[in-house]
Swiss-Prot record:
Protein name: Biopolymer transport protein ExbB
GO biological process: protein import; transmembrane transport
Membrane topology, as annotated: Multi-pass membrane protein
Keyword vocabulary terms for this entry: Cell inner membrane, Cell membrane, Membrane, Protein transport, Transmembrane, Transmembrane helix, Transport
Superkingdom, taxonomy of origin: Bacteria
Ranges that cross the membrane: 13-33, 67-87, 101-121
Subunit organization: The accessory proteins ExbB and ExbD seem to form a complex with TonB.
Keyword RNA-binding: no
Species lineage: Bacteria, Pseudomonadati, Campylobacterota, Epsilonproteobacteria, Campylobacterales
UniProt-listed Pfam families: MotA_ExbB
Subcellular location: Cell inner membrane
Length: 145
């Protein structure tokens, strides 16, 4: 019988959330390193036009923006699904002691914590890279006047 089951959700919610956040953190690190290398090697004299420079300077910053703005929501989704599993288990078992419930809730919150752990460094990197992009663009403008 293929369909939605709470047992399947219980088995795969952490795997799914951690996989998505793991891929997001890998991509964020990859693009941060790529931008740092590009910014360190960019030759402003090779550009004739500020628009072409700005296109190259802001390349891949949108990906970082998407990651830092969505990682907390992915974590929150994992937490909500984890809490759903806890409530389901409570309903099926006819009741649980407070200790078991608290352990389950604390484990469900790890998804939100991981989402924030991905989002916060990505936000810091994004803002730093955006500032560096603005500085390089301004240096180009000064150089051309």
């Amino acid at each position: 019988m293929g369909g939605f089951s709470m047992a399947m959700l219980k088995d795969y919610v952490d795997v799914f959330v951690f996989a998505v956040l793991g891929v997001a953190s890998f991509l964020a690190l990859w693009f941060v390193i790529e931008r740092v290398i590009f910014y360190s090697k960019v030759d402003l004299k090779a550009y004739d036009d500020i628009d072409a420079l700005n296109l190259d300077l802001t390349k891949n910053l949108t990906i970082l923006y998407v990651i830092f703005s969505n990682a907390p929501y992915v974590g929150l989704l994992g937490t909500v699904l984890g809490i759903m599993v806890i409530f389901y288990d409570m309903g099926v078992s006819g009741g649980m002691d407070a200790k078991t419930i608290m352990v389950g809730l604390s484990l469900a919150l790890k998804a939100t914590a991981l989402g924030l752990a991905v989002a916060i460094p990505t936000l810091i990197a994004y803002n730093s890279l955006l500032r560096k992009s603005d500085v390089l663009s301004e240096k180009f403008r000064i150089m051309k006047t």
